[in-house]
């Protein structure tokens, strides 16, 4: 997948897009779970941790399929430091209007786009035999929004 985008000595945009989707979609799932009101998840560390778990599952699959984890700062995605950074970010977007601006407004107004992205990632993960039970659970909880 995306092999046509690889070029020598350059960042592969396909790798970046896979990694970006693996981070963004759990946030979209959270928006759909809360009907766009991320403040409902404020303080719900268990759910926010599941978002991070889903991201990590998918980064493993992306790496196992031979893709590079991008940006380079995220290559240590299984570390405690990565989890801590992600948790802080997710807490911030759930506790402030930043979540509405950065995540909710986009997810709630781009359901077709997020659904297509989810379908494409699902297909990719099935092709590479990814083990992603947390991702699948968050996907189910997104409910009626994903098509």
Indicate where each model-derived feature is located.
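Internal alpha-helical scaffold of NAD(P)-dependent oxidoreductase catalytic cores
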Residues: 1-70
């Amino acid at each position: 997948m995306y092999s046509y985008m690889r070029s020598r000595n350059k960042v592969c945009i396909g790798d970046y897009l896979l990694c970006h989707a693996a981070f963004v979609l759990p946030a979209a799932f959270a928006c759909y779970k809360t009907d766009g009101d991320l403040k409902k998840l404020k303080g719900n560390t268990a759910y926010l941790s599941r978002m991070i778990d889903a991201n990590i599952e998918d980064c493993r699959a992306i790496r196992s399929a031979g893709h590079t984890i991008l940006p380079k700062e995220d290559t240590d995605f299984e570390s405690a430091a990565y989890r801590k950074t992600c948790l802080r970010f997710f807490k911030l977007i759930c506790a402030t209007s930043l979540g509405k601006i950065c995540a909710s407004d986009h997810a709630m107004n781009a359901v077709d786009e997020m659904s297509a992205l989810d379908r494409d990632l699902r297909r990719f993960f099935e092709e590479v035999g990814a083990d992603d039970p947390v991702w699948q659970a968050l996907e189910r909880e997104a409910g009626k929004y994903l098509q």
